Amino acid sequence: MYFALGFPYLWIRQDAPRQTLRGKTSFSLAALPSAFTIFAQTACRSFFATPAHPVEKTFREKYPLLFSVNSPADLRTLAVNVLPQLAEELRNYILDIVSVKQGHLGSNLGVVELAIALHYVFDTPHDALIWDVGHQSYPHKILTGRRDAFLHLREQGGLSGFPSRAESPYDAFGTGHSSTSISAALGMALADQLRGDSHTQHIAVIGDASIASGMAFEALNHAGSTQTNLLIVLNDNAIGIDPVSGALEKHLQDLLGGIDTDNFFRTLHITYRQVSDGHNIPQLIAALQQVKHLPGVKLLHVPTIKGKGFPSAEAEQILYHYPGHFDRTTGLLKDSPRIRYQDIVGEELLHLARKDETLYALTPAMPTSSGLSILRTEYPSRVIDTGIAEAHTLTLAAGMACRGLRPFVVVYSTFLQRAYDQIVHDIALQNLPVRLLIDRAGIVGPDGPTHHGVFDLSYLLPLPNMTLIAPANGCELRAALHLAARYDRGPIAIRYPRGEAQDDTPTEETMPFGQGRCLRPEGDIAMISVGAMLSVARQAIARLPDEQRQRVSLYDLRCVKPLDASLLREVFTRSQAVLTLEDGVRQGGAGSAVALWAADNGFP
């Protein structure tokens, strides 16, 4: 018998008499789930916890022009010659908040003038304005009635760090992943055209290297064959999270440099215009007013500087993409002394690469945040940054595996789902030994629902030939990476969370293939922990009264597929109740896999 309790599954032996579970210690069936829930809530709150911020009155005095703009309608009443002052106040307001709250900094500093110009020229929210990637939407949010709420950026119950249709009518389309804006804006434009609406404007602001994604190319290809009222604003800062890779970037620089032969966009029947300075508000307004009245699909090429106006962010654009806490005056970052899971990945891949010349690391546009900088420094040719191209990355790795290389694909869990068909068709069905290192698995905190990595267990577990490992801490992650390097019998995935690693004490322990482990053999009520939930399980057990705690045994599953049948048989044979804890959705996850195993093996 199973009961759903948030993330966990709870199994209770059907023939267990009620008094057996309660016994002399009066053990409550709700005790373990309740203890878990308390710690889960505490963990979630810790993701959002931020220092107190100065009161709003201070900002009103500091930024009087910004605090006079409560909506784009207010913005449009201002004279053009005062808009640079508004831009300065807006930029400094973002710096004040993000230095304390944490968030995406460089991209937002780079689009301050562009956001002002767009809302000045277009009739938002009637005109649909879509911000690609979403992490460059802070100026847009502040100008559209959410200035005060920005004090609670990325807090639980506060303002999302990404556009959200549920949050504001000014957010025409929710964006957290990249390269979706042109498709969405084109869909809206086609719908309005079919309804006879020829006046509504549809604007897709795409930047931070998102234009080079396959989905953006597909949308451009379709858009060029239409006569829709669509404007694409290319925010070209020549960098994503890391420097842009790929041939398109050279073409874009040629266009900005005046080399306009073989213009890629014109060959697709898209009207092309550009400005010389994406931080010159009068120039931006003039260009936007011009393209606004042109027929058909248009593209305005806008060069900007990522981190504009904050010297540290301009000089170190990679670090200040998402800097964490930093000193508002000096720009100095407030680093954490503890090692991250991502650091472990980089260190161990470097160690393995020194012994295996067939090892290559692939990443879709995120080498630095994924921990690969250390490997790229020593072996630059063995770290392949494919750009924002998850589908291509997976099939590229499959092709490399066909030729005897050992590719490790390092990708965020939330972005891996963009390449699901490639995992199924190109890797799993062909049983190719591609190693998937699934970063940011589980709950990732204030980045919110677009970035939580809670689906990977459910969509990988059903796949044929797939092995899936969930290390509980830094030591197990190191062991799992070494296991993956030796495993050539098919695809293998390792999922691990964001941030500081738990228990990274050096160890010589290896991870036997397909085996979990028993950590507390004491009792007849079993907890099976999956991955990083082990620390939560231990804390939950510690909260129980002594007599109840003695009845709880604890298991670290480690290998989610294949399951350790020997371990599970021991668990279900000796236990009156079994609780599984995982940081993923309940349907189709590790708990349901354990439940299915129990049913198949006579433990209904």
Predicted features along the sequence, with ranges:
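N-terminal amphipathic, basic-rich helices that act as targeting or association modules
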Residues: 56-142, 277, 281
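A glycine-rich helix N-cap at a beta->alpha junction
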Residues: 150-159, 225-237, 428-440
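Non-catalytic terminal/interface segments that mediate subunit docking, oligomerization
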Residues: 310-417, 422-432, 528-531
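Cofactor-binding active-site loop characterized by glycine-rich and histidine/acidic residues
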Residues: 62, 104-226, 341, 358-359, ...
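Peripheral docking tails and interdomain loops at the edges
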Residues: 333-337, 445-447, 466-467, 591-604
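Glycine-rich ThDP/TPP pyrophosphate-binding loop and its adjacent helix/strand module
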Residues: 171-338, 342-347, 466-575
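A short, small-residue-rich loop immediately preceding and capping a beta-strand
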Residues: 101-103, 127-130, 173-174, 197-213, ...
